Every structure is written in structure tokens, then in C-alpha cells.
């Protein structure tokens, strides 16, 4: 199963959320627990058996069985379980900052026997500190996309404390790194700034989402990388919801 470095929700939280909000989705190869009213990822898993297949196809073609991956924004683990399968002799280091989503991530790693994944309920940036971030109450929502959750600092009494870490500091002793995969909902630049030493040392493949505001800034930040826009559309409503994605390779 996945190896978590954080305390799980207490029993009351688990009973409250799991009994009222969770459903099971079975695909051809995997089993997932998801929030029942979540939108895109759930629907894609149910219809197609995967989420963002083009991204996973790139991972399959590039990674080896002993590869190591850092995944920033693992969500419920729809990519994580596949990365675990691909890199069966390597390690996956997955970050997810949303408290409830982090619990689902760990549950899905357990259900799919992912023994090579380490999980962290921490935010990734270019600094190291503790902040209080907003907690999303999904129970009060009708339909939502929990994949849009991002770092939002609030006053202490309105949220929960979380470690903010840089990848350079977190993994200063790591011996191997083949891929950095980032889904940080507009926070990609601080994540990359905080990983510049790792990138310089290991020259990993970089798969990162971007938005139109930071596209050129990502390119400028790492001139030693060639960034290819591999944007594709979600399988559902694919004319409305573009998924903007960079593939970065060392020059």
C-alpha cells in the first residue's frame, strides 16, 4: 500500500464523509473510491476506464520499471496507480494538499496494492514554512471538480495547518529522478523554482499543466529545457474544457 507521512482523518470524519459522499468505480485494471458528486475524473473513469490517457501514454513510453517519479497534485490517484504499475521497481512520491482528497488517494493506493508510493499531505512551492489553508466543504456542493483545489492561505481559525515545502529541500538526498509531473492549478512556477537543483542534477522529463498567464514564464524559467505544448482536450465536453499541458525535455 502507499506509505503516508501524515495523520489520517479521525474516525468521526471518516464515517461522516465515507458513508455519505463516497462511491466506488471499477475500471478494467483498477478500483477507485471517489466523491460521488465529482465531475470530470469520475465520468472519464466510468466511461473510458482512465483519466487523461495521453499523459499516461507519454509516461509509459518514457519511464522504465525502476524509474522514480515526483507527482505534485496527485488528487485521488487516478494517475498514481498507473505510475506505480509502470515503475514497479522504482518509487513514486506523491503530494496532495486537500485533506479529504488525500484520504481517498491513500485508500486507492491500498485498494490497488501500490506498495512503492510515498504520499505527502503537503503543499509544494519554492519555500519551506507552515501556513493555514482553506478547507473545501464538498458536502455542501451539488456538482464540483475537486481537481481544481489549490493552495489558498487563510487565517488560522478558518482552515487547517499544512507544511509548504520545496522539492529541492524535501528530496535533497534522493538518488534518482526520472519524471516531475505537476498539476498545481496555476502554482506551477513556484513548484518549478523550488525544484531547480533537482532539475539541474537529474534532468528529468517534466510534464506540467499551465495556464495562459504563466505559459511563457515556464519557458523562460528553464531555458535548458525544450517545452512542447501537448495540450489536448478532456474526453468529455472536449470543445469547452481544454487541458493545457507542457512536455519538457532537456536540450
Can you name each region flagged by the protein language model?
Residues 110-115, 199-202:
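Short helix-capping segments at alpha-helix termini
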Residues 28-56, 115, 120-175:
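Glycine-rich adenosyl-binding loop in Rossmann-like folds that engage adenosine-containing cofactors
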Residues 1-108, 112, 156-157, 173-174, ...:
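S-adenosyl-L-methionine
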Residues 22, 87-94, 166-251:
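Conserved acidic-Pro-Pro-aromatic motif
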Residues 70, 93, 120, 163, ...:
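Conserved Rossmann-like nucleotide-binding pocket used by diverse enzymes
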Residues 110-112, 134-140, 218-226:
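Short, hinge-like loop/turn segments at secondary-structure boundaries
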Residues 81, 106-107, 132-133, 192-196, ...:
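Short amphipathic alpha-helical segments
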Residues 74-76, 99, 126, 184-186, ...:
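Short, glycine/acidic-enriched loop or turn micro-motifs at the edges of active sites
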Amino acid at each position: 500500500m502507499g506509505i503516508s507521512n501524515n495523520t489520517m482523518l479521525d474516525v468521526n470524519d471518516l464515517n461522516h464523509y465515507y458513508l455519505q459522499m463516497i462511491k466506488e468505480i471499477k475500471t478494467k485494471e483498477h478500483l477507485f473510491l471517489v466523491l460521488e458528486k465529482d465531475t470530470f475524473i469520475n465520468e472519464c473513469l466510468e466511461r473510458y476506464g482512465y483519466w487523461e490517457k495521453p499523459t499516461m501514454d507519454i509516461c509509459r513510453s518514457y519511464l522504465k520499471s525502476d524509474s522514480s517519479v515526483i507527482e505534485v497534485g496527485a488528487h485521488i490517484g487516478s494517475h498514481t496507480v498507473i505510475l506505480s504499475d509502470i515503475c514497479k521497481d522504482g518509487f513514486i512520491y506523491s503530494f496532495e494538499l486537500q485533506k479529504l482528497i488525500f484520504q481517498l488517494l491513500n485508500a486507492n493506493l491500498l485498494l490497488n496494492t501500490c506498495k512503492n508510493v510515498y504520499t505527502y499531505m503537503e503543499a509544494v512551492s519554492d519555500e519551506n514554512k507552515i501556513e493555514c489553508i482553506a478547507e473545501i466543504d464538498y458536502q455542501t456542493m451539488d456538482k464540483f471538480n475537486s481537481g481544481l483545489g489549490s493552495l489558498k492561505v487563510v487565517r488560522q481559525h478558518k482552515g487547517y495547518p499544512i507544511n509548504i515545502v520545496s522539492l529541492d529541500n524535501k528530496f535533497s538526498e534522493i538518488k534518482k529522478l526520472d519524471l516531475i509531473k505537476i498539476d498545481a492549478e496555476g502554482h506551477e512556477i513556484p513548484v518549478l523554482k523550488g525544484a531547480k537543483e533537482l532539475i539541474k542534477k537529474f534532468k528529468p522529463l517534466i510534464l506540467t499543466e499551465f495556464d495562459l498567464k504563466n505559459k511563457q514564464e515556464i519557458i523562460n524559467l528553464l531555458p535548458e529545457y525544450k517545452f512542447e505544448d501537448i495540450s489536448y482536450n478532456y474526453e468529455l465536453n472536449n470543445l469547452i474544457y481544454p487541458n493545457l499541458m507542457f512536455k519538457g525535455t532537456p536540450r
